[in-house]
Regions:
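Nucleotidyltransferase catalytic core that binds NTPs
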Residues: 1-203
């Protein structure tokens, strides 16, 4: 048995809340004697802070921040531009000869990820190709997020993008782990703002 545990997320921007997901990946890896991998979306689109397609940070920039913010997992982050979706990540792991796959996701996404991964497991895709064929697949919940809670439990990318837009420096920096210096936190806020369509009053 050769097992892998992975997560896939937007991380726009990375926050203290994402530690919950990464920690869950690490725990699952220990539980199942598996290797841990963390993938990030490459999506980048300059829109308003609350747009669902808002992805202000470029991929390479985001991966650099992730490694600095979560140095304990720096070796687990995968930087590979051939991996665009969570299905590509599964294929990437299958090509590494893993036979058992575990994915960690938010509680609200467990069902949809389970359905999609099983839909393609050992089954041809639209082009007739089998992109992966694991002996077993399981999607594990990283827990729920309470948007009204303080700290990591209630942190979200939307809150962080709004704080960056409104130049709410204290609020923005409170959502970033202290593995970044104050100057680095301010630089991240600047980079997020640069990737947003800002209202005239916030420019």
């Amino acid at each position: 048995m050769k097992a892998a545990v992975y997560c896939f997320g937007r991380f726009q921007p990375p926050t203290i809340g994402h530690a919950k997901v990464f920690d869950a990946v690490a725990r699952a890896a220990r539980t199942y004697n598996a290797d841990a991998y963390m993938f990030a979306s490459q999506s980048h689109k300059k829109t308003k802070f609350d747009n669902k397609s808002c992805n202000p940070l470029l991929y390479d920039m985001k991966m650099d921040y992730l490694k600095k913010m979560f140095p304990q997992y720096a070796s687990n982050f995968v930087v590979d531009k051939s991996v665009v979706t969570f299905l590509h990540a599964a294929t990437w792991l299958y090509m590494k000869d893993y036979t058992h796959l575990y994915m960690v996701a938010g509680s609200d996404r467990v069902g949809s990820y389970t359905e999609k991964l099983n839909q393609y497991n050992c089954q041809p895709d639209k082009s007739g190709e089998i992109i992966f064929c694991f002996r077993s697949i399981e999607v594990i919940s990283a827990g729920t997020r309470d948007p009204d809670a303080d700290g990591a439990q209630g942190m979200s990318g939307t809150k962080m993008r709004k704080a960056a837009q409104d130049l709410e420096t204290t609020a923005f920096m409170s959502g970033i782990p202290n593995t970044l210096s104050i100057d680095q936190k301010l630089e991240l806020m600047h980079d997020v703002r640069a990737g947003l369509v800002l209202p005239k009053e916030n420019k």
